[in-house]
Amino acid sequence: MNKFLNILKEIALYIWQLPQNILGLILLAIYRPETKFVAMNGNFVYFASRMGGGISLGKYSIISSFYYRDDMIEPLATAVAKHEALGHGTQSRYLGPLYLPVVGLSSIIWAGLYGAVIPYTKNGYYKFWTEKWADKLGGVVR
């Protein structure tokens, strides 16, 4: 019975995050990652050489291979992986279909402006509310 309820919960959660999950699957096809791991929250974390930074959409996080090394004991222990998979992944679970218009759109606009219009500072990117919240949820201290 417990296993059945867990399966139902996972199905409901996948549907709750369906817009992000669909977009995440599309981006997986585009970026064709080379390495995959499962994060602590059950999200899938992919490392792709074609990805410039990182993005989390529902159960799927795609992170630049720049942040991955073969000799890593725990690749998901990096701040970038925690920020993406655990931080933004938890935001997606909380907000469901509101994640893309609230967090996703804000983050994309911020990423486009940061460094181009807004002056670059060390860890300044992570001071924006969506990124600061993702760091907090992911347990990242900068």
Give, region by region, the residue ranges found by the protein language model.
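Charged, low-complexity, helix/coiled-coil-prone segments
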Residues: L18-L27, I73-A85
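Metalloprotease/metallohydrolase-associated module, dominated by Zn2+-dependent proteases
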Residues: N2-G52, L100-R142
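Short amphipathic alpha-helical segments and their helix-coil junctions
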Residues: M1-L5, H83, G87
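Catalytic Zn2+-binding segment of zinc metalloproteases
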Residues: A85-V103
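Short pre-active-site segment immediately N-terminal to the catalytic Zn-binding motif
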Residues: M51-G54, S61-K82
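Alpha-helical architecture
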Residues: L57, A81-K82, L86, W129
